[in-house]
């Protein structure tokens, strides 16, 4: 199936980044969120990113204009969803919220449309089961920032068809990404490796082994990481990190995935 028009649900950092990737890849893209101010902020962020590419000589002014013309933003979901080939959900990492969105997308999108989730940890099988088209539901997990990071995890739920998985995989390749096909396990691969490392860094801080700055220096200077695990935790959001750890802990029942008490305390404090 050829993908020509894409709907991205959620105009935050991830959603707007995904919309930018799709538009730069030649897709007509509709960016949707629940309030106009969120949509405007997302589109403004994309314009800023594109302007930087022009300044750096990585894109011509004409190319920027063409990409911008392929983008539009809306609040009303009904009209936006009626003629798309692919819908990508990129909202808060909460299963109830995602299920509600997929039920609505299922009722609004054309029968042929693929419904993809940018979830970083939640089960695609459970999300797909809320729809009448589970064979056309898959994971399409971009990493932050989406326009820069090459990796895309393409996740096959229990009912996801091979055709759906291959279509999304090929689309990611078309955008110049490095997609990988994965089975539906908690945290997939990226977050199953990365988030426990961040949790362990938090545990090291909790035990007073080193300061936050020193822990991040170890990761950057010793492992060659561009960003330390605690700085990365702040960028991702401690609440999101805690949620992912809870998904891993519940999904595997393994104590190595137990969230650090300090992480839980920080989230309770609103940090």
Regions found by a protein language model. Give the residues of each.
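Acidic/polar active-site rim loop that often engages polyanionic ligands
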Residues: 27, 145-154, 226-227, 246
């Amino acid at each position: 199936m050829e993908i020509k028009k894409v709907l991205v649900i959620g105009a935050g950092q991830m959603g707007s980044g995904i919309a930018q990737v799709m538009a730069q890849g030649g897709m007509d893209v509709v960016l949707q969120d629940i309030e106009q101010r969120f949509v405007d902020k997302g589109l403004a962020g994309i314009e800023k990113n594109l302007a930087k590419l022009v300044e750096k000589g990585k894109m011509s002014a004409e190319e920027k204009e063409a990409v911008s013309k392929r983008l539009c933003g809306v609040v009303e979901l009904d009209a936006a969803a009626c003629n798309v080939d692919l819908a990508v959900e990129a909202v808060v990492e909460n299963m109830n919220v995602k299920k509600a969105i997929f039920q609505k997308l299922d009722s609004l999108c054309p029968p042929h449309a693929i419904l993809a989730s940018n979830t970083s940890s939640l089960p695609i099988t459970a999300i797909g089961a809320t729809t009448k088209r589970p064979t056309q539901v898959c994971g399409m997990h971009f990493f932050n920032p989406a326009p820069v990071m090459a990796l895309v995890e393409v996740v096959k739920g229990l009912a996801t068809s091979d055709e759906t998985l291959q279509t999304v995989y090929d689309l990611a390749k078309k955008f110049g990404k490095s997609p990988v096909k994965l089975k539906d396990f908690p945290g997939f691969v990226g977050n199953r490796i990365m988030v426990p490392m961040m949790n362990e860094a938090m545990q090291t801080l909790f035990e007073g082994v080193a300061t936050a700055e020193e822990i991040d220096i170890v990761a950057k200077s010793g492992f060659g990481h561009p960003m330390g695990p605690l700085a990365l935790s702040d960028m991702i959001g401690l609440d999101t990190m805690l949620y992912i750890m809870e998904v891993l802990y519940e999904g595997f029942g393994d104590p190595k995935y137990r969230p650090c008490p300090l992480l839980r305390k920080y989230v309770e404090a609103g940090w």
